[in-house]
Amino acid sequence: MSKEERPGREEILECQVMWEPDSKKNTQMDRFRAAVGAACGLALENYDDLYRWSVESYSDFWAEFWKFSGIVFSRAYDEVVDTSKGIADVPEWFKGSRLNYAENLLRHKENDRVALYVAREGKEEIVKVTFEELRQEVALFAAAMRKMGVKKGDRVVGYLPNSEHAVEAMLAAASIGAIWSSTSPDFGVNGVLDRFSQIQPKLIFSVEAVVYNGKEHSHMEKLQQVVKGLPDLKKVVVIPYVSSREKIDLSKIPNSVFLDDFLATGTSEQAPQLEFEQLPFSHPLFIMFSSGTTGAPKCMVHSAGGTLIQHLKEHLLHGNMTSSDILLCYTTAGWMMWNWMVSILATGAAMVLYDGSPLVPTPNVLWDLVDRIGITVLVTGAKWLSVLEEKAMKPVETHSLQMLHTILSTGSPLKAQSYEYVYRCIKSSILLGSISGGTDIISCFMGHNFSLPVYKGEIQARNLGMAVEAWNEEGKAVWGESGELVCTKPIPCQPTHFWNDENGSKYRKAYFSKFPGIWAHGDYCRINPKTGGIIMLGRSDGTLNPNGVRFGSSEIYNIVESFEEVEDSLCVPQYNKFREERVILFLKMASGHAFQPDLVKRIRDAIRVGLSARHVPSLILETKGIPYTLNGKKVEVAVKQIIAGKAVEQGGAFSNPETLDLYRDIPELQGF
C-alpha cells in the first residue's frame, strides 16, 4: 500500500500524550485488524495500516466489516458498491440485500438484560426496561401503527423528550419500514413546522409538558399550533409525561388520543408479535434536518443499512463497546447524537436516557448517575466540561466513577485545557475522545480510538472507511495547515437524497459545489502529520453552532422580520481564542424607530418562544447598514471575518461595500 503523501510543514505544536492504549488489551479493533489480515493476505501492523487499507480498498473494507459485525439480514448482497462511481454519484451500497434496522437493534436474546435506564430531572426513580420488555413495547407500538394504516415509506414523527417512548416509537416505525423524524420539546412552533411541514407526517407523538431547569414547561399550546400546521396528520398521540391523563385536555387537538388508548387499538386477545419488514439496504430510515442557513432546513434522507453499518463500526471498532457497557449520551431527540446513541442497542449494550438539565439540582447530576448505574461511557458536550471547570468541580474527589472508561466530547471543538481538566479532576485512566462529524452523515468522520494515544487538543484519528483530508482553496491536500474538511470517496452513511429535491440540485449544491465530485463538509480543520490527529477550527460557512446547537441564520431572520421596528437584520457567529462561539444579531432600524432595550427584550422572547432558548443571540446590537452581494444575498461570511479581525477581499461582489466598515472595531465585541 502506498503511504499518503504529506507535503507541507512538519513542525507542529508540542504533542502532549494524555492517555495511552493498553498494549495487553485485545480490542475489537485488534481482532478486526487480524481478521482482515488473514482474509485478505495483508500485513496490517497498526491502525495506520488498517486505516489506509480501509480507504484505498473501501469496498473490501465494508465487506469485511459486514461479516465481522454480524449484521442480521434475510438476503445477502450481490455487490458491495460500484467502485467506478464517486461520492458525488451517491452509489447504492450492498445492492440486493434485505434487512431491518429495528431487528438488528432488538436481536439480543438475553431477555432479562437491561436495555434502557430512564432518568428524569426531579425524579429519584430510575426506570429499567429490559430487552424483552423493549421488544414487547415496540410490538405494541407497531401493531397500533399498522392498525391506523401506517405503512412502508410513511413519515412518523416525534416532538418528544429523550425518553423510552421516543425509542419505542422510532423502533416501531423502523420495523414497519416507515420513516422517522424527531425534534425536541425545546423547539418552538416555527422551528418544528419549518421541518415537519416539508415531510407531511401521518402520525405524531408528543408529550403534554416537560421539566427543565427546575421548572415545568407546558407543551400543549405549542402542540396545538404544530398540529394545525400539519394537515396530513391522521393521528396525534399524546403521552402523559408530567401530569396524569385526567389533568390533560385534548379537546382542542383534532385526531388526538392518549398513548394507552392508541396502543390498545393494536391489541387483541393475544399480545402482538414483532414483525420486521425486510427492506433494501438503501431504504429510508431517518429524515434529518439541516440548520436552515439559506431558507427552509434541508431534509436529509438516511438509509437503514447505511446508518446501521456506520454506527456499528463506530460503536464496535472505535468505541470497543460490548454487551457489558452502559452508555449515557447527554442529548435531545432533536440532535443526531440521539440517533447515534440508540444504535448502541445493536451491540447488546444498554443506554441511559436522561431528560433534564445537566446542572440541576446540582452540577453533579450526571456524575451521580454514573456512580448509581455503573455507566461505562459518558457522551457530552465540550461546553459542559468547560462549565464544570469554571465551577471548579472535581468529580475525582466526590465520586468513585469506578466503571467509567470513556468520556466522549462533541458538539463543538474540545479545547486543550479541557483535556487537562478531565485527566486532572475527573479520572486519569479514561479515554477522552473528541468526536466530530455531523447530521449530514448522521455519524463521525473522526473520533475516538482505543488503539491510539490521546494527544492534548486533538481528535485521535480519522475513522475507518472515511477518506478525509484537509484541502486548501486550490483543491490540494494540506498537512499541518488549516484546510476545508473533505471526503474524497463514497461512504454508506451519506444521505441517499434530500426530501423534495427531485433533480438532486440541493444535494449537489450542499456538498459538491466547492470542489466538483468531492464532499466538502463545511468545516475547517488541521491534520497533524506527526500524530495523525485532527484539530477542528470551526465552521467554514455561515451556519451558527453555539455550544453544538447548530442552526441557520434564516431561522432567526424569520422571527425578526415580524417586528415592524426592524428594517433588516444580520446574524453571525463570533469566536474567542478557544474556538467557543457566540451569536451576534445586528438590527437595522426602520425609519422613525429607535433601538430600545424593550425591543431587544421582545425579540429575545420571540426567538425563545418561536425557536428555543438555545437560539437566543448572546448580543443584539444596532447597525446602520447591512452588506449585500450584487445578486441580493446578505453577506454573513464577510462580516464574520471582519469581527474576527480578518481582512476581506471586496472585489466587485458587494452592492454596498461601504457597509463592511460598520463592523470593524465594535466596542461591545472586544474581550470575548
Curated annotation (Swiss-Prot):
It comes from the Eukaryota. Keywords: ATP-binding, Cytoplasm, Fatty acid metabolism, Ligase, Lipid metabolism, Nucleotide-binding. PROSITE patterns: AMP_BINDING (PS00455). One of its GO terms (biological process) is fatty acid metabolic process. It catalyses: acetoacetate + ATP + CoA = acetoacetyl-CoA + AMP + diphosphate. Its main location: cytoplasm. It is found in: Cytoplasm, Cytosol. The keyword Nucleotidyltransferase does not apply. The keyword Lipid metabolism applies. One of its GO terms (molecular function) is ATP binding. Pfam families: ACAS_N (PF16177), AMP-binding (PF00501). Its EC number is 6.2.1.16. InterPro entries: Acac_CoA_synth (IPR005914), ACAS_N (IPR032387), AMP-bd_C_sf (IPR045851), AMP-binding_CS (IPR020845), AMP-dep_synth/lig_dom (IPR000873), ANL_N_sf (IPR042099). One of its GO terms (cellular component) is cytosol. Converts acetoacetate to acetoacetyl-CoA in the cytosol. Ketone body-utilizing enzyme, responsible for the synthesis of cholesterol and fatty acids. Belongs to the ATP-dependent AMP-binding enzyme family. This is Acetoacetyl-CoA synthetase. It comes from Macaca fascicularis. The lineage of its organism: Eukaryota, Metazoa, Chordata, Craniata, Vertebrata. The gene is AACS.
